[in-house]
Amino acid sequence: MGELTFTEWERKNEVASQRIQQLLRVLSKSKMLHVLYALVTKGENLRFSEIKKSSFTDSTTLTRRLTELEDIAIISKNEVSTNPPVVEYQLTESFSTIKPILEDLLHYGLEDANNE
């Protein structure tokens, strides 16, 4: 595999830039970090009500945030065929690439809270 041509480099740079911008748009939405924090700290296969309780988010906002996270493949939704039907959410492998960034944000917040 040789060096990239300038055009190839530009194309890859543009794709990376678009992905970063998309992620930042999603993460900056109201209650998004609360939802992700709930998913990270509460474990796998969380139900809507568990995420809602842990994230202090109303149903409408939570539905939007979960859909947005699903759209960018950060979470997946699993519909369990039971009566009544159950929907569970879990983080995907894609999340592992941004998990350290969110952990750093959490540590920053905790450090700031400890200084007050």
Regions found by a protein language model. Name each.
Residues 1-27:
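N-terminal leader segment of winged-helix/HTH proteins
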Residues 18-61, 88-90:
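N-terminal helix-turn-helix DNA-binding core of bacterial DNA-binding proteins
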Residues 34-37, 70, 106:
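A cross-family signal for key residues in well-ordered alpha-helices
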Residues 39, 62, 66-69, 91, ...:
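Generic leucine side-chain signal with a strong bias for well-ordered alpha-helical environments
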Residues 48-77, 84:
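Canonical helix-turn-helix DNA-binding module
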Residues 81-102:
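Basic, amphipathic "hinge/linker" alpha-helix immediately C-terminal to the N-terminal HTH DNA-binding motif
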Residues 97-115:
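Short, solvent-exposed amphipathic helices
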